[in-house]
Amino acid sequence: MKKIGIFGGTFDPPHNGHLLMANEVLHQAELDEIWFMPNKIPPHKQNEDFTDSRHRVEMLKLAISSNSGFKLELAEMDRKGPSYTYDTVRLLKERHPNDKLFFIIGADMIEYLPKWYKLDELLTLIQFIGVRRPGYHIETPYPLLFADVPEFDVSSTMLRERLKAKEPTQYLMPDKVRQYIEENDLYES
């Protein structure tokens, strides 16, 4: 039985903060693997524009390529419509019935758990790992495991803005991702 952490996100673009968080959770929770799972249409971001799925997947492949504990899971990319965690987890449990699945969420998402689609059913299928960050006070009635991650103040939104303004992004994202973005003229407008 493998212990697998599922790390969902738009990863638009993936950055070193994502990698730092995943690596800390991998070790603190003693997981075998972290599966990076890009969302196609996150329910809480349905009115936003995203970079083409193909580019986000390619950037993510490049970002995680140097860590053997990191894998890519495309279950949500293969589906139509909003990406509800409950539906995805049911599918992954069917595909991997002997593995123990953990779903990784940031401190900012913990307060939104009561609004998650079919949360009570989801809690019977998976264990959540909440990532604590400085500045967030976390209180929740839900049975979460916690991981502490050093503060690394970077976001995909900030990177898109820096890229658009032609500001430096070195050390904020993997060099391979930065090169892919430049070669494919992403985030310029």
From Swiss-Prot:
Q: Which reaction does it catalyse?
A: nicotinate beta-D-ribonucleotide + ATP + H(+) = deamido-NAD(+) + diphosphate
Q: Which GO terms describe its biological process?
A: NAD biosynthetic process
Q: Does the keyword ATP-binding apply?
A: yes
Pathway annotation from the record: Cofactor biosynthesis; NAD(+) biosynthesis; deamido-NAD(+) from nicotinate D-ribonucleotide: step 1/1
Q: What is its EC number?
A: 2.7.7.18
Q: Which Pfam families match?
A: CTP_transf_like
The kind of enzyme this is, by top-level EC class, is transferase
SUPFAM superfamilies according to UniProt: Nucleotidylyl transferase (SSF52374)
Alphabetical keyword list:
ATP-binding, NAD, Nucleotide-binding, Nucleotidyltransferase, Pyridine nucleotide biosynthesis, Transferase
Note the NCBIfam families from the entry.
Answer: cyt_tran_rel, nicotinate (nicotinamide) nucleotide adenylyltransferase, PRK00071.1-3, PRK00071.1-4
What does this gene product do?
Catalyzes the reversible adenylation of nicotinate mononucleotide (NaMN) to nicotinic acid adenine dinucleotide (NaAD).
What protein is this chain from?
A: Probable nicotinate-nucleotide adenylyltransferase
Please state the gene responsible for encoding this protein. nadD
